Amino acid sequence: MKIRIKVKQLVLFVLLPLALLIVIPGVLQQAAAPSVQPATSAAANTVSKAREELLNTLNSNSGSKRMTLIRTRIIEPGNARPPYQYNVYIGSSSSQWSQNNNEEPPSLLLPGDKLRFLKEYVLEGPIDRYLLTAAKQLAYEYDVLGTGSDGDKVLTEAIARISSKSSLARELLLLQAQRALSAGNWAAAKVLLMQADSPGHYGEEELNARSAWLSARLLFAEGDSSGALKLVSNGLESYQEVRDQKYQEMNEGNGGDSQDSQDSKDSKNFQGSTVSASPPESLKATSQFLEEPHSESERQLLLMRNALLSAAEAGNSAPATLSGTLTYSDGTPVSRAGIFLRPESEVSHSVLNGSEPYEIYTDAQGRFSFSGVIPGYYQLHLGLSFEQIDGWTWPVQTDDWIEIKPNDRLTNNIILQPLLELKSPVNSQILTGDSVEFEWEAVKNAASYSLSGTVSAEGSTFSYVIRQHITGNKISIPVTELYNSGGFSTSSSGEGWESVKPSSLLGFADPSGRFSWSIEVYDESGRVITRSNGYRLNEDTVGNLPFFYLQSRSLTAADQLVKAQKLEQALEAYRHDYAGDPQDDHALKMLVHLMTAKASYTKDKSLEAATIPLLVKLVELRPTADYVFNLAHYYYEQSDWKSYNHYYSWFLELREQKPHSYDQGINAIALMYQGELDEARSQFVASLEEDGSHRFIGSYLAAELAAGQPLDDVLKLAQRYPQHSPGSSTVNWAKLITLMKAERTGQPELFDRQLKQMLELYTARSGKLREWIGESGDSALKTFMKAVLEVG
């Protein structure tokens, strides 16, 4: 039995524990040390006094000593949290947080104070690297006040102080050029980039790469997409040539024994000749090392080149603009926040401070704007301090993609919502009854609520959705339903299936576990309005803690073995318990869980098959929607359509609500395999409309072609439902259909005949299709069919 991964539920599994873990440290810190929470009047007076003392110290000195004080008391502390570095990053696909307890304390000075002293250092201080740092901090202060033009004037004056041939002058020019690009001032950016590339700058590959990156952005913004692609490609090639040369020189300098000497010779020939079948290990490592970008400059060039190539393939040669505001729900603007417009290829990794292709701060009114954006699919991410997000949430969803088309002028306003308050069970309440009464704050305009639970035990957490589409703000859940929870997740201890975390297997059936819960609120369109889990960091926002203990049962001897992570012994103990009492549904459930976990790790097909009769018995004792769907999915994999249809129909009865988009997609494929093309196509549409990632679009396109739809119509569907799969290779189905159209023009009758044959093999689930794909020779049709086989 295969482990099913539903995209949206996977995200809940990954992100929900993260969010709760973020809340908990802050909550516990508040409980342990309330004195560090909201500033009292005495604390405010202390800060005010310290500010006055610092101002007096700065104002009472002059000359070099004054500049030294500005550097040590303002510029250097400002580096503790540089621009675009925040406590919390929130996005559609992921969230992250950090808190460095060793950070310098925040500046005592007000923004106006910092502006004055930073400007003085930039215009009168020593010409050193601290001048560049001060210039960046000064530009930031002007930007967040909404007076970026004043910052540009100061930068211009600073550049005039410095030799035009110095690297420092060039860095300042590139900084100013990037600011002009971000502001949409192409003319100013062009002049600044020309100045930055004036003769005399040699041996500065990092600055050369940055100049190429900015210049390519400018060319695209001006409408010269082909010129931008050529420039960034040349810049990348030049950068990599210098990089490779440095590695070759480094290897040559490592001379020693004969093996090192041979490594050096091979390394010198790495770029231009064929490497022998068994190269030295050091050369293998170097080869692998050079395949990946090894600096932010190289990564930015690669990213831009790929974005421009994708835009060119789609015929998108004109830039776009996206702007908006970031506010709280009461209308208060959120200033000094980071806004990151991240392309689809980049959203699977954490935000890279200061190196994202499109990043900007919100000004005093919460405004932000991106100009010269390359068309494509993007997601917005926010950078916030703990203070900014404390008690609030951004109700963003996994599939919140922004499609940016040529010449678009889009507006995307972001509104933070107050966190939902939980009522019961809370604050580590111990429950011993037959049900759990969940209750939470009612939310205006809420159409439904989703209840999720998290199991915390032995240093690990495991989360899942308990109930969806709840219409009121309270619900009673039988403990037996909670006991049905569980799956398995791994820990760092142990090897193979013995590394499965006990808490993930026992779930809510562990009376020693501490459990927590959360609520998400949805409107009538299925959009998230707000949620309960988030950042609560002080006594005004902490509210009730979402923890409780469920002690309605005691651990069995077999359970104790699971707790001790003696899983082989536990497996036999549960087998013995079930043999002694065929009505022992807990022993049977745990037996199925353990066997499934072991089969998954060992790839033992016979063990997998052996779980099915037990799962059949389990659904007789505990007929839950998830258990029944697991059976349906098993028979789907076996192409046993009679059994599949039986269990899928039963699943729909037990679910009592519309199925998840994943379930609909699987059922659509099953219907297609059974020759029910019309119903399959209808189910595909229902799945795709619910799933913003469009996971099953490839199968839907195959079904449409099998139904005799022309390639032109199928192309429109591919464009309507583009696949999104961050973190893995995304298939451009529209491109594949376009290539098939071009291939068909040569011999349309032959193409149509072969397409029909391959689709018949596909819908019959015939192994001959894979044999045909594995044959020599490439074609657009073969590429398409290969991609279709990978859907699911």
Stretches found by the model and what they are:
Residues 2-41, 413-559, 563-575, 579:
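Long, contiguous interaction/recruitment modules in multidomain scaffold/adaptor proteins
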Residues 69-73, 111-122, 149-161, 187-198, ...:
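Alpha-helical repeat scaffolds
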Residues 237, 283-295, 385-411:
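Structured interaction patches on ligand/partner-binding surfaces of diverse proteins
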Residues 287-321, 327-332:
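Beta-strand-rich domain onsets/edges
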Residues 320-328, 366, 414, 558:
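A short, amphipathic beta-strand motif
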Residues 347-367:
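Short, acidic Ser/Thr/Gly-rich low-complexity loop/linker segments typical of extracellular
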